[in-house]
Amino acid sequence: MSSSNNAAAAAASPDPSRRREDVVGWLLALFPDLPLPPPPEATDEDLRAALATGRLLCALLRRLCPGALLDDASTDNVGRFRAAVERMGVAKFSASDLERGQMTAVVNCILALKDRFGSRGGDDHRNPGFLTRCDSEGGRKRVESKLQRMLTSPIMSGIPGVDKLTIATDFVMVFQLKQGGYADQLGGKYSDLLKSTSLDNAPTQSLLGVFNSILDESIERKNGQIPYRIACLLRKVILEIERRISTQAGHIRNQNNLIKAREEKYQSRIRVLEVLAGGVSGQTHEKEGMINLKTVKAEETQRIEDEESKKEDVARLLTDKENNDSIISELKKELEETKRLHEAHSQQLETKAAQVSKELEQRIEEVKLMLDDSTKRRIELEELSETRIQFWKKKEVVIDQFVSLQVQNVQDLKLSSVSVRHEILNCQNKWSEELAGLGKSLKVVTNTAEKYHGALAENRKLFNEIQELKGNIRVYCRIRPFRPGEDDKSSSVEYIGDNGELVLSNPTKQGKEGGKNFTFNKVFGPITTQDAVFKDIQPLIRSVLDGYNVCIFAYGQTGSGKTYTMMGPEKATEKEWGVNYRALNDLFNISHDRRDTITYELGVQMIEIYNEQIRDLLGSGGVQKKLGIQNTIQPNGLAVPDATMCPVTSTSHVIELMQTGHDNRAMSATALNERSSRSHSVVTIHVRGQDLKTGNTLRGALHLVDLAGSERVDRSAVTGDRLKEAQHINKSLAALGDVIFSLSQKNAHVPYRNSKLTQVLQTSLGGHAKTLMFVQVNPDVSSYTETLSTLKFAERVSGVELGVARSNKEGKEGKDVKELMDQLSLLKDTISKKDEEIDRLQLLNSSTRLKPTRQADSVLKHSSSSPGITSLGKGTSVGSGAASDLDNFSDTSDRQSEAGSMLSVDPEISGLADVDSDGRTRAVNRVQKLTLPKAGQSSSLRPKPRDPAPAATGVRKSSTSQATPLARNNSTLKRGP
């Protein structure tokens, strides 16, 4: 029954559970280890779980029909099984049926496979292509038609004693061999075909078909190789065909001889009949003659027909013989070619066999050697094991003796343990007493140590407070790491201590003379990170939000890493930020944390001092904008009021501004540094905070100064503009050194005006500010001279005392101070007007040739009786520029006219009040301290005239040059730089 009929019969079965049980039972019979319950207990879900992955289906098909599955990496196991089943013509199922649908289609498919392959039980090893072709209905019809034509052929009918059914059965197998491929058959098949009886009973046409099938199979293989058994079968078939042809030829000769003998016999009979017919008379003889004649004629007719049929058979046999001869010749040629290929292949196999035999002989020799070694090793191991056995036996005896001795010792120990226990108890009691005493002593020592550490911490705190009260400039030294290409083994820095110690070694001197010792607040080594440097100065920066002015500047020779410390490298990441970025970020974070108590406003200025000119780096004009300096000490530290003030609200905004300023800064390459700063950069962050509870105002300023590096012209090899820049840089740094020296010597006169750099830093170096200097050191031996000079300068800086830093707070008392300052500004404005009136009167008096002394005295008396002075507390509408007139300073104003103006204030300000640093009012008999400079100090509160006419200014200069008596008496007052 075909597979389609089986599937239809299975589908027509009325009991699906019975079909499922049949499938489960068959699967368990094929795969005993399958995790399925017994057939009566198995359900559709159990069967679906076992078949879901498709592995069981593929294993079943491999067992029933090996090679039917195709290796397709893009298809899963279920898809491969379904494709193979579809090629075989078996009822298939869809993937959805196996996943969540009914299992009926799956069961029908498996039952169809069982019906087709169940009788073989998985032992059918035919080629899958043959199964696909021969099991189909068309294939079977083609085979049956071929067999039918062969059985009904004249050749088969002419062979007596042949069982057609047996021949058909045998050559169905031969045809199957052709279709399925002879290489896949078992040895028994070939043995059956080689039997002489099988070939003897086969028709000649079938033998030729087998021969052609073998040749076709050889051609399909495309390698020209025929297995030995097939070659033997082929030779047997050819011999059988030759034998049959020779036998047919003998039969033909015998038939010809027999025909000739029969012809002679018939002719003799005819002659006898003729004689009898002529000699016999009478009716009886005639009747007998007629009967004999009819018989003879019938026999003659039959003979003629037999002869014709025999002639036809002979002609057909001759034709077949000719065809067979041609076929045999072709077969012989093909057989010769096959023999030649077979001989070549045999020769290759013999060569390969010889090589393999040689290799096997070598391997056998190696194995023999290994066997000999193993034998020797076995003998040695046996001897060694025997020796060890004897050794362990002796050791066993010794151990037995030792164990007996130990048992005796244990018994002795048990006896002595009692006495030892008593001794231990006594010792424990003694130890407890000693431990109690040690505990008391340890407690005393611990208390002493705690007091010592407390005293040490207190001493350190007191030392820091003393340094804070003195207002010393903090000095941090940072050692630059070696650059690629520099000799990192020859360093001028010999030792770096944990407490700020630094030892500089002179490469030209050895011993004690070659070392220089320095001590600073902190020394950072070459491997110190930017974050570690910032953490040490973080408390100082945070004091800006408490109202203090803080200045941090970097000093050192060119190429020592000043810009790296202050700004960081180009396109720096957050980890590589310098002090500037980290300080601003920290200020924003703290101001955000304090937003519930204090609101802060932050503004940023960024300038550079290039060739003794101040440039605004944040202005719309870029580096082309030149600015003036304000030398007066302001609470907010605003030294350059005309510079662009940019309010900032976030760190990203500050970074963008600072990057803009950094791009506008003058940079150039020298022989010592590829990115040498050719100007001094000053970044100022102004902080204004207002306490939400008290209403007090805090003002602080953070100055971040990146000084240009000092350089030796012979080493930097600069010319032209770079040489001019280097000269200005060295000049400004020399002026800074003079200021530091004057401050360290506590001189009355400090030369701030010698350089624009010292004028900008005046509020930080000469005011009540917290100042820190980074000293950048190049450890290269070739820069020893510059390094030594830098460290000596830093040592002088560390000895400068600036005084106690003051917080810029404006509370209720601060407002009084501000009002007083406004009144003082109004007074200055009034004095300026009086000076103009004096100039006008002097012009009138000069025209009438009056004496200058009397004119000045009358003017001074008139000024003292001016109603504007008596109503000083009420006159607040004099002008909005009064306060700025007090604070501003003009570098081009005439000093003598300023002296005359300030001296004229003395008799009119005796009734004012002054405020000290704590905001408390006191008697103001010393208000001239705000207007007149002390001896040896610079004047910081000199008024600027409110744009007088040029003619009046010239007159005032001439009149004051004549000097009133009071002016002549005070003309020897010292002025600041």
From Swiss-Prot:
InterPro entries, A to Z: CH_dom, CH_dom_sf, Kinesin-like_fam, Kinesin_motor_dom, Kinesin_motor_dom_sf, P-loop_NTPase
Source domain of life is: Eukaryota
Calponin-homology (CH) domain location, by residue?
A: 17-118
One Gene Ontology cellular component annotation? Answer: microtubule cytoskeleton
Supply the name of the protein: Kinesin-like protein KIN-14D
Q: Looking at the record, which segments are called Disordered?
A: 1-20, 852-977
Tell me the lineage of the source organism. Answer: Eukaryota, Viridiplantae, Streptophyta, Embryophyta, Tracheophyta
From start to end residue, where is composition biased (Polar residues)? 861-879, 956-977
Annotated organism of origin: Oryza sativa subsp. japonica
Keywords (A to Z) from UniProt: ATP-binding, Coiled coil, Microtubule, Motor protein, Nucleotide-binding
Q: Name the Gene Ontology molecular function terms of this record.
A: ATP binding; microtubule binding; microtubule motor activity
Instruction: Using the record for this protein, list the coiled-coil segments as residue ranges, or answer none.
Output: 297-384, 812-847
Residue ranges annotated for the Kinesin motor domain, each copy included: 472-800
Query: Biological process (GO) annotations?
Result: microtubule-based movement; microtubule-based process
User: Where, by residue number, does ATP bind?
Assistant: G556, Q557, T558, G559, S560, G561, K562, T563
Encoding gene, per UniProt annotation: KIN14D
